[in-house]
Protein backbone atom coordinates (compact mmCIF):
# COMPACT_ATOMS: atom_id res chain seq x y z
CA UNK A 1 0.00 0.00 0.00
CA UNK A 2 2.81 2.40 0.85
CA UNK A 3 4.52 1.77 -2.50
CA UNK A 4 1.28 2.36 -4.39
CA UNK A 5 0.53 5.63 -2.60
CA UNK A 6 4.15 6.79 -2.95
CA UNK A 7 3.65 6.49 -6.71
CA UNK A 8 0.60 8.78 -6.71
CA UNK A 9 -1.91 5.96 -7.02
CA UNK A 10 -4.51 4.33 -4.79
CA UNK A 11 -4.99 0.67 -3.85
CA UNK A 12 -7.63 -0.74 -6.17
CA UNK A 13 -8.80 -3.60 -3.94
CA UNK A 14 -8.81 -1.99 -0.49
CA UNK A 15 -12.45 -1.39 0.40
CA UNK A 16 -13.71 -2.63 -2.98
CA UNK A 17 -16.86 -4.62 -2.19
CA UNK A 18 -15.61 -4.23 1.43
CA UNK A 19 -12.43 -6.25 0.79
CA UNK A 20 -10.17 -5.60 3.83
CA UNK A 21 -6.70 -5.52 2.23
CA UNK A 22 -4.58 -4.04 -0.54
CA UNK A 23 -3.46 -7.42 -1.91
CA UNK A 24 -5.14 -10.77 -2.45
CA UNK A 25 -2.64 -13.34 -1.14
CA UNK A 26 -3.51 -16.97 -1.92
CA UNK A 27 -1.08 -19.78 -1.01
CA UNK A 28 -1.11 -23.37 -2.27
CA UNK A 29 -4.71 -24.59 -2.65
CA UNK A 30 -6.25 -21.14 -2.24
CA UNK A 31 -7.37 -20.07 -5.70
CA UNK A 32 -7.98 -16.32 -5.30
CA UNK A 33 -9.06 -13.58 -2.88
CA UNK A 34 -7.01 -14.86 0.03
CA UNK A 35 -6.68 -12.47 2.96
CA UNK A 36 -3.06 -11.90 4.11
CA UNK A 37 -2.10 -13.49 7.44
CA UNK A 38 1.01 -14.23 9.49
CA UNK A 39 1.24 -17.96 8.74
CA UNK A 40 4.85 -18.72 7.64
CA UNK A 41 5.47 -20.01 4.15
CA UNK A 42 7.36 -23.28 3.76
CA UNK A 43 9.85 -24.57 1.22
CA UNK A 44 7.86 -26.03 -1.67
CA UNK A 45 4.86 -23.72 -1.25
CA UNK A 46 3.41 -21.54 -3.99
CA UNK A 47 1.58 -18.26 -3.45
CA UNK A 48 -0.35 -16.03 -5.83
CA UNK A 49 -0.34 -12.27 -5.36
CA UNK A 50 -3.12 -10.26 -7.01
CA UNK A 51 -2.81 -6.46 -6.97
CA UNK A 52 -5.15 -3.75 -8.18
CA UNK A 53 -4.30 -0.06 -8.55
CA UNK A 54 -6.26 3.07 -9.42
CA UNK A 55 -4.21 5.82 -11.08
CA UNK A 56 -5.40 8.85 -13.03
CA UNK A 57 -8.94 7.52 -12.95
CA UNK A 58 -8.18 4.10 -14.44
CA UNK A 59 -7.67 0.66 -12.92
CA UNK A 60 -4.92 -1.88 -13.40
CA UNK A 61 -5.22 -5.51 -12.25
CA UNK A 62 -2.33 -7.97 -12.19
CA UNK A 63 -1.49 -11.38 -10.69
CA UNK A 64 1.49 -13.71 -10.49
CA UNK A 65 2.07 -17.03 -8.71
CA UNK A 66 5.43 -17.32 -6.96
CA UNK A 67 7.23 -20.47 -5.89
CA UNK A 68 8.91 -20.71 -2.48
CA UNK A 69 12.23 -22.55 -2.52
CA UNK A 70 12.28 -25.90 -4.31
CA UNK A 71 8.93 -27.07 -5.65
CA UNK A 72 7.96 -30.42 -7.14
CA UNK A 73 8.16 -31.06 -10.87
CA UNK A 74 4.37 -31.54 -10.85
CA UNK A 75 3.76 -28.06 -9.46
CA UNK A 76 6.33 -26.56 -11.86
CA UNK A 77 4.46 -28.08 -14.79
CA UNK A 78 1.21 -26.60 -13.48
CA UNK A 79 2.84 -23.16 -13.25
CA UNK A 80 4.34 -23.44 -16.74
CA UNK A 81 1.13 -24.64 -18.35
CA UNK A 82 -1.03 -21.94 -16.80
CA UNK A 83 1.44 -19.21 -17.78
CA UNK A 84 1.61 -20.56 -21.32
CA UNK A 85 -2.18 -20.49 -21.51
CA UNK A 86 -2.19 -16.82 -20.52
CA UNK A 87 -0.10 -15.94 -23.55
CA UNK A 88 -2.09 -18.24 -25.82
CA UNK A 89 -5.19 -16.36 -24.69
CA UNK A 90 -3.56 -12.99 -25.30
CA UNK A 91 -2.75 -14.08 -28.86
CA UNK A 92 -6.48 -14.42 -29.55
CA UNK A 93 -7.24 -10.84 -28.49
CA UNK A 94 -7.35 -9.31 -31.95
CA UNK A 95 -9.87 -7.43 -34.03
CA UNK A 96 -12.73 -9.59 -35.25
CA UNK A 97 -12.16 -12.39 -32.76
CA UNK A 98 -14.59 -13.09 -29.94
CA UNK A 99 -14.43 -13.79 -26.21
CA UNK A 100 -14.75 -17.51 -26.85
CA UNK A 101 -11.52 -17.52 -28.86
CA UNK A 102 -9.58 -16.53 -25.74
CA UNK A 103 -11.64 -18.80 -23.52
CA UNK A 104 -11.20 -21.91 -25.65
CA UNK A 105 -7.45 -21.35 -26.11
CA UNK A 106 -6.95 -21.21 -22.34
CA UNK A 107 -9.28 -24.11 -21.60
CA UNK A 108 -7.88 -26.43 -24.26
CA UNK A 109 -4.25 -25.90 -23.26
CA UNK A 110 -4.88 -26.57 -19.58
CA UNK A 111 -7.38 -29.40 -19.87
CA UNK A 112 -5.21 -31.20 -22.44
CA UNK A 113 -2.55 -31.29 -19.72
CA UNK A 114 -4.99 -32.72 -17.20
CA UNK A 115 -5.74 -29.59 -15.16
CA UNK A 116 -9.01 -28.14 -13.88
CA UNK A 117 -10.18 -24.77 -15.20
CA UNK A 118 -12.15 -22.81 -12.59
CA UNK A 119 -15.67 -21.95 -13.75
CA UNK A 120 -16.92 -19.60 -11.04
CA UNK A 121 -14.25 -16.90 -11.51
CA UNK A 122 -13.39 -15.12 -14.76
CA UNK A 123 -11.40 -12.32 -16.36
CA UNK A 124 -13.07 -9.06 -17.29
CA UNK A 125 -12.97 -5.73 -19.01
CA UNK A 126 -11.48 -2.87 -17.06
CA UNK A 127 -11.03 0.88 -17.24
CA UNK A 128 -12.72 3.48 -15.05
CA UNK A 129 -14.22 0.56 -13.12
CA UNK A 130 -12.27 -2.45 -11.90
CA UNK A 131 -14.74 -4.91 -13.37
CA UNK A 132 -16.33 -3.99 -16.68
CA UNK A 133 -17.92 -5.81 -19.61
CA UNK A 134 -17.15 -8.21 -21.15
CA UNK A 135 -16.48 -11.12 -18.83
CA UNK A 136 -13.55 -13.24 -20.07
CA UNK A 137 -14.06 -16.84 -18.91
CA UNK A 138 -11.17 -19.30 -19.06
CA UNK A 139 -13.49 -21.85 -20.66
CA UNK A 140 -15.76 -21.64 -23.67
CA UNK A 141 -16.30 -22.32 -27.34
CA UNK A 142 -14.26 -20.72 -30.10
CA UNK A 143 -16.28 -18.15 -32.05
CA UNK A 144 -18.79 -17.48 -29.28
CA UNK A 145 -19.34 -14.32 -27.26
CA UNK A 146 -18.79 -10.60 -27.71
CA UNK A 147 -16.70 -9.49 -30.69
CA UNK A 148 -13.50 -7.58 -29.93
CA UNK A 149 -12.93 -4.10 -31.36
CA UNK A 150 -10.07 -1.63 -31.27
CA UNK A 151 -9.69 0.29 -28.03
CA UNK A 152 -10.98 -2.46 -25.76
CA UNK A 153 -9.05 -3.20 -22.55
CA UNK A 154 -9.42 -6.53 -20.76
CA UNK A 155 -7.83 -8.50 -17.94
CA UNK A 156 -7.04 -12.10 -18.90
CA UNK A 157 -6.46 -14.29 -15.86
CA UNK A 158 -6.26 -18.08 -15.99
CA UNK A 159 -7.07 -19.67 -12.61
CA UNK A 160 -5.96 -23.26 -12.97
CA UNK A 161 -6.16 -26.17 -10.53
CA UNK A 162 -3.93 -29.22 -10.41
CA UNK A 163 -6.94 -31.44 -9.79
CA UNK A 164 -10.66 -30.78 -9.92
CA UNK A 165 -12.09 -27.58 -11.38
CA UNK A 166 -14.46 -27.40 -8.40
CA UNK A 167 -13.91 -24.80 -5.68
CA UNK A 168 -15.28 -23.88 -2.26
CA UNK A 169 -16.04 -20.38 -0.98
CA UNK A 170 -14.97 -19.97 2.65
CA UNK A 171 -16.96 -18.41 5.47
CA UNK A 172 -14.75 -15.28 5.55
CA UNK A 173 -16.69 -14.20 2.47
CA UNK A 174 -13.60 -13.94 0.28
CA UNK A 175 -11.19 -16.87 0.16
CA UNK A 176 -11.76 -19.45 -2.58
CA UNK A 177 -10.11 -22.89 -2.25
CA UNK A 178 -9.86 -25.95 -4.46
CA UNK A 179 -12.40 -28.57 -3.41
CA UNK A 180 -9.75 -31.31 -3.32
CA UNK A 181 -7.09 -29.18 -1.57
CA UNK A 182 -4.66 -29.61 -4.48
CA UNK A 183 -2.61 -26.57 -5.63
CA UNK A 184 -4.01 -23.78 -7.78
CA UNK A 185 -2.17 -21.08 -9.76
CA UNK A 186 -3.20 -17.67 -11.08
CA UNK A 187 -1.60 -15.36 -13.65
CA UNK A 188 -3.07 -12.12 -14.99
CA UNK A 189 -2.21 -9.48 -17.58
CA UNK A 190 -4.06 -6.35 -18.70
CA UNK A 191 -4.22 -6.03 -22.48
CA UNK A 192 -5.41 -3.28 -24.83
CA UNK A 193 -6.31 -3.75 -28.47
CA UNK A 194 -4.39 -1.26 -30.59
CA UNK A 195 -4.40 -1.45 -34.40
CA UNK A 196 -6.20 -4.75 -34.18
CA UNK A 197 -3.52 -6.46 -32.07
CA UNK A 198 -2.87 -7.03 -28.35
CA UNK A 199 -0.70 -4.55 -26.45
CA UNK A 200 0.35 -5.52 -22.93
CA UNK A 201 -0.36 -2.85 -20.32
CA UNK A 202 1.17 -4.91 -17.50
CA UNK A 203 4.50 -6.68 -17.18
CA UNK A 204 6.18 -9.40 -15.17
CA UNK A 205 9.62 -7.92 -15.90
CA UNK A 206 9.98 -6.29 -12.47
CA UNK A 207 9.23 -9.66 -10.88
CA UNK A 208 11.70 -11.43 -13.13
CA UNK A 209 14.38 -8.84 -12.39
CA UNK A 210 13.88 -9.28 -8.65
CA UNK A 211 14.03 -13.07 -8.95
CA UNK A 212 16.96 -13.07 -11.36
CA UNK A 213 14.93 -14.65 -14.17
CA UNK A 214 15.76 -13.75 -17.77
CA UNK A 215 12.24 -12.88 -18.81
CA UNK A 216 12.93 -12.43 -22.51
CA UNK A 217 14.25 -15.98 -22.77
CA UNK A 218 11.39 -17.38 -20.73
CA UNK A 219 8.67 -15.72 -22.79
CA UNK A 220 10.26 -15.59 -26.23
CA UNK A 221 8.18 -18.40 -27.73
CA UNK A 222 4.97 -16.93 -26.33
CA UNK A 223 5.58 -13.53 -27.90
CA UNK A 224 6.57 -15.13 -31.18
CA UNK A 225 3.19 -16.86 -31.18
CA UNK A 226 1.39 -13.56 -30.54
CA UNK A 227 3.26 -11.63 -33.23
CA UNK A 228 2.62 -14.35 -35.78
Annotate each PLM feature.
Residues 1-228:
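Active-site neighborhoods and metal-handling regions in enzymes and metal-associated proteins
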